[in-house]
Regions:
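Short Ser/Thr-interspersed hydrophobic loop/turn segments at strand-loop and sheet-helix junctions
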Residues: 16-21, 112-113, 130-135, 158-161
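Glycine-rich beta->alpha junctions and the first turn(s) of the following alpha-helix
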Residues: 22, 136-205
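Short Gly/Pro-enriched turn/cap motifs at secondary-structure boundaries
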Residues: 30, 57, 72-75, 99-102, ...
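Residue-level signal for inorganic ion chemistry
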Residues: 46, 128, 156
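A short, Trp-centered hydrophobic/proline-enriched beta-strand micro-motif
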Residues: 60-68, 112
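A structural signal for short hydrophobic beta-strand segments in well-ordered beta-sheet cores
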Residues: 82-85
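A short core secondary-structure module
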Residues: 94-140
Length: 205
């Protein structure tokens, strides 16, 4: 409530999303923000991050995306090469993400990056909140076979972030990311959105 929400139970969110989808409402842009990013910020985020992002997420004004997959790594999330380098000014992010859903419509990316030089696999990873309008970010669309634009490549060229942009504990990004991903299938969005589309196709046939 202190950041503009209603402190309601997750099952109540489930019911609201169910009704929105049943009515065909366009709620997809906000799913990641309220379902995954906000709970992670509440649990692990700095006070500055909570103040910067949670009120806007509660109002539906801030949309987020998740920066996980990278080129050449397939579905191996432990193969992250995008780096976070600590400097006197803050953190410098360099690298690339791919297959990022909705990056072109998002205000913030929650990214899993390698913060410890020389670390391997799931060790030495941290999570950062990256404003998508920050200098040094380039977004390139990936157009699917149907001509739609949903996925993106995102490039980071020495993107500067403040200290508070790190979410949680340095080097504990893997544990935090797996906890966050447990929320990804916590709602009815996937199957109900498909059901609405299937019904529309049947009606149009």
């Amino acid at each position: 409530k202190e950041v503009g929400g209603h402190a309601r139970h997750p099952l109540e969110r489930y019911v609201v999303i169910e009704e929105l989808l049943a009515a065909g409402a366009p709620g997809g842009a906000h799913w990641i923000a309220d379902r995954q990013t906000a709970p992670l910020i509440l649990r692990y985020g700095s006070e500055e991050a909570k103040a910067a992002y949670l009120p806007g997420i509660c109002k539906g004004e801030i949309h987020t995306c998740i920066g996980l997959s990278e080129p050449g790594a397939g579905s191996d999330l432990a193969a992250v090469r995008t780096s976070a380098r600590h400097t006197p000014e803050g953190w410098r992010i360099s690298g690339q993400k791919i297959w990022t859903s909705g990056a072109h419509m998002s205000h913030v990316m929650l990214a899993l990056v390698r913060s410890e030089e020389g670390s391997e696999r799931n060790a030495g990873l941290s999570q950062f909140l990256i404003p998508m309008d920050a200098p040094g970010i380039t977004i390139r669309p990936i157009i699917d076979m149907g001509g739609d634009h949903h996925f993106n490549e995102v490039f980071f060229d020495d993107v500067l972030l403040p200290e508070w942009a790190m979410v949680g504990t340095r080097g504990q990004g893997w544990a935090q990311a797996t906890a966050e991903l447990a929320l990804e299938r916590s709602g009815p969005e996937r199957y109900l959105s498909s059901h609405v589309l299937m019904t529309a196709l049947i009606d149009a046939a």
